[in-house]
Amino acid sequence: VTAEEVIDLVHKKGMKKAAQEVDVVTTGTFGPMCSSGAYLNLGHSRPRIKFGGGSVYLNDVPAYAGFAAVDVFIGATALPDNDPRNKIYPGEFNYGGGHVIEELVAGKDIRFVATTYGTDCYPRKRLETLINIKDLNEVVLFNIRNAYQNYNVAVNLSDKTIYTYMGVLKPNLGNANYSTAGQLSPLLNDPYYKTIGIGTKIFLGGGVGYVAWQGTQHNPNVIRGDNGVPRRGAGALAVIGDLKQMKPEWLRGVSFLGYGCNLMVGIGVPIPILSEEILRYTAVKD
């Protein structure tokens, strides 16, 4: 059952009976997760070229090339060199790394440009071509901090509008922005990480992924409620998966006015019901 359905089930049948009947509770979240990106292996051209030490662009968005000859990594928040940023305030940030990843997974051709220095074994100094996900050796989504367990509500106490990664905040408490899947959220349904850990198989971006490690800034030692739910930012997941299996419906490049670009990521995590205690955690409500 889903993390929403289990709430009614527990209410109708009680914790003990529900724990006997339910094998797995499915959880999910879909939101902007800026510590996301993808690494690509393009294979070797003729003559060969070494990207490492040079510069690489995908649809004019810079990627990191400090690996071996033909490995690159593109981050969700990367911006083209010619983007005006906030010189025109608030900046629109119409296209960035998250949009490139969405277009890659959608099967669109991506303009790839690399410039570097030549060597005896890699004599080529420039490569400009179109790449497509179906032709690449590996394309892997690797997100170092996703599915944050809890987070702040953002408000603005000043007398002017401000533009943030939590959206546009109106002056004088004119609005309050937050981002959570509530009772569906994976780490709110397993607040002490009893079933979610390294190697957990998950739904990632419309395909299959895995929990690779704890996410950056993972901090389980926070104040919690009686139900285990943290009262501030706590746990996070680092996740990995084959981008070739994923779908653009679950990986969306987005723009935050006055702030920058991002990638919305869909994540689903199954929680095996091994005990009444674990079921009790999954009955958490909004």
Language-model features and meaning:
Residues 2-286:
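Anaerobic metallocofactor- and corrinoid-dependent redox/one-carbon enzyme cores
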